[in-house]
Amino acid sequence: MSHQCYLTGKKTMVVNAVIRRGKARREGGVGRKTTGITKRVQKANLHKKLIRENGVLKRVWLSAAALRTLNKGPYQGVELACRC
């Protein structure tokens, strides 16, 4: 089972970690300068939950955003098996 949201498709992303020095112009400096850029991993906020989809129980990964949306009930035929 991959670490990917079952409903929204959110998963791990590769993003840039930017290191800067200097003082911002709005604070009276000459501006921020980039001194280094490296790759880093940004993980989705995933939780393993039990859902009922068309009467069948499934244990899946759900993002926090999908859990909030699921509590409102807009996904057709999908509901949390336990409101814990």
From Swiss-Prot:
A Pfam family matched in the record: Ribosomal_L28
One BP term from GO: translation
Gene Ontology terms for molecular function: structural constituent of ribosome
InterPro entries: Bacterial_rp_bL28, Ribosomal_bL28, Ribosomal_bL28/bL31-like_sf, Ribosomal_bL28_bact-type, Ribosomal_bL28_sf
GO cellular component terms attached to this protein's record: ribonucleoprotein complex; ribosome
Keywords: Ribonucleoprotein, Ribosomal protein
Similarity comment: Belongs to the bacterial ribosomal protein bL28 family.
Name by which UniProt lists this protein: Large ribosomal subunit protein bL28
